[in-house]
């Protein structure tokens, strides 16, 4: 007999927290360096080795430098890690809508995310999924998550709320300059979050993510360029979602994915757009209006 596997606030927290926590922590941190290695004659450019400039660069790479919309997509595969052995579970296609607004002391980001689960290595939407470790077949239910608004200080640090989608959580993260090579710049975003889904006395849902974001250096340091396309890769280690019904099996979920950030909604991956237009046509038809709706409620 099949059970229901809700793609809900409790089992999308890995992807979502990684996205929401991009750029959080005590602040953006440029790499330690005695002096900027940028060639002379670039006066007026942002310096990635200066803390204030790096906060601006970080905002541009993660979102955009001015007010408006941007969009991110992610293709990933989820694995079960049990006794050092990886078992593919399924793949996923995620898309996120971001609206950025500058505030008096920083900026705020409103996010709406939509994830579709697919068969491993394909774009085929899953209506049910067989857990290879338990043998149980789980029916899939899907829904958008958000919109949720988070506030950032001018230095790039997040004003952490006390709850996330109605659940108490604790989080920390860092965003730092990883490397500059030629006309490429890389940032590392490491985040760690614990979501107390069953109250403070029960083990939390634990999300650890390592994200790498890459963009063109010339775009990043240009103070007149607020729209910097970027690519990203992520690796996550998460607790079992409750809805996987893993029982007493000891292990973790591993997610490996790649994606990008763009500024034209119609240039999101075609497979994701096709699913969104079929299943959530209201979001596809008017992404701006979707960001103004009341956040959907998801329960197991």
Where are these regions (language model features)?
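N-terminal export signals
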Residues: 2-6, 11-33
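Active-site-adjacent core segments of small-molecule enzymes
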Residues: 47-50, 54-92, 96-109
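Short beta-strand segments that buttress and anchor functional surface loops
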Residues: 75-78, 189-195, 236-237
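Predominantly extracellular/secreted and cell-surface proteins with exposed
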Residues: 84-220
């Amino acid at each position: 007999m099949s059970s229901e596997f809700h793609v809900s606030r409790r089992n999308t927290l890995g992807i979502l927290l990684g996205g929401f926590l991009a750029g959080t922590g005590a602040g953006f941190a440029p790499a330690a360096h005695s002096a900027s290695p940028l060639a002379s004659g670039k006066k007026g450019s942002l310096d990635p080795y200066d803390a204030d400039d790096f906060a601006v660069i970080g905002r541009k790479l993660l979102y955009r430098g001015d007010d408006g919309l941007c969009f991110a997509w992610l293709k990933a595969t989820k694995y079960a890690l049990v006794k050092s052995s990886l078992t593919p579970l399924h793949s996923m296609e995620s898309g996120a809508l971001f609206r950025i607004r500058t505030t008096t002391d920083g900026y705020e980001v409103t996010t709406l995310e939509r994830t579709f689960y697919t068969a491993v290595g394909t774009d085929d939407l899953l209506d049910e999924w067989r857990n290879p470790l338990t043998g149980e077949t789980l029916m899939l239910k899907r829904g958008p998550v958000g919109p949720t608004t988070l506030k950032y200080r001018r230095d790039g640090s997040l004003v952490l709320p006390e709850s996330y989608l109605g659940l108490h959580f604790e989080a920390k993260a860092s965003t730092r300059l990883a490397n500059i090579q030629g006309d490429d710049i890389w940032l590392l975003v490491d985040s760690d979050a614990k979501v107390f889904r069953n109250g403070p006395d029960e083990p939390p849902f634990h999300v650890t993510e390592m994200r790498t974001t890459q963009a063109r250096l010339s775009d990043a340091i240009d103070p007149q360029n607020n729209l910097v396309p970027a690519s990203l890769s992520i690796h996550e280690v998460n607790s079992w979602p409750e809805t996987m019904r893993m029982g007493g099996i000891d292990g973790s979920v591993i997610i490996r994915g790649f994606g990008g950030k763009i500024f034209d909604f119609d240039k999101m991956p075609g497979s994701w757009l096709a699913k969104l237009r079929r299943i959530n046509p209201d979001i596809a038809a008017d992404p701006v209006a979707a960001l103004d709706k009341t956040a959907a409620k998801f329960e197991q």
